Amino acid sequence: MKNTVNDKILLTQQKLEEIEKELEHLINVERVNVIQEIKDARSQGDLSENAEYDVAREKQGIIESRIRELETIISKAKIIKADLGSSRVSIGSKVSLENVESGEIQTFQIVSSIDADPFKSKISNFSPIAQALLGQHQGDEVEVDVNEKYSVRILEVINE
């Protein structure tokens, strides 16, 4: 599995808390509801032609599968901690950079692929831009290759 270090899954503390909250909801709400749906469908009699029963059983399978997946992620979670006070780019760093040619400035956080959410300016550590930036320092100029090559200057690295 990607994003593993010695079979650990890299996550931010925030993402781990989101996963734990989702797991709690699935166990305490969704699982209970689907069990009731199955009971209600069974009470309608013949299961061989009972579409409600089939739908509820399929839904139960999806819920149970997601519960197992989340439990595995939690059991293998390793919290990402940025290098506090360092100007070096690492997983967990918030980075501001400037495209040397266009002057365009971007700011994002480098996170694991499980945490990645481009709409929240969180990019995967496996993305080409993150790969180019990891290990670099504030002030460095780095070449990035995404369909075409371009240079960026690291303006700021925040590790908190």
From Swiss-Prot:
Pfam families, sorted: GreA_GreB (PF01272), GreA_GreB_N (PF03449)
Recorded superkingdom: Bacteria
Translocase is among the record's keywords: no
GO biological process, one term: regulation of DNA-templated transcription elongation
PROSITE patterns found in the cross-reference section: GREAB_1 (PS00829), GREAB_2 (PS00830)
GO molecular function annotations of the record: DNA binding; RNA polymerase binding
Stretches of the chain forming a coiled coil according to its record: 2-84
Alphabetical keyword list: Coiled coil, DNA-binding, Transcription, Transcription regulation
Gene3D superfamilies with a match to the protein in the record: Transcription elongation factor, GreA/GreB, C-terminal domain, Transcription elongation factor, GreA/GreB, N-terminal domain
Keyword Coiled coil: yes
Family: Belongs to the GreA/GreB family.
Functional summary from the UniProt entry: Necessary for efficient RNA polymerase transcription elongation past template-encoded arresting sites. The arresting sites in DNA have the property of trapping a certain fraction of elongating RNA polymerases that pass through, resulting in locked ternary complexes. Cleavage of the nascent transcript by cleavage factors such as GreA or GreB allows the resumption of elongation from the new 3'terminus. GreA releases sequences of 2 to 3 nucleotides.
PANTHER family given in the database record: TRANSCRIPTION ELONGATION FACTOR GREA (PTHR30437:SF4)
Protein name as it appears in the record: Transcription elongation factor GreA
Gene behind this protein: greA
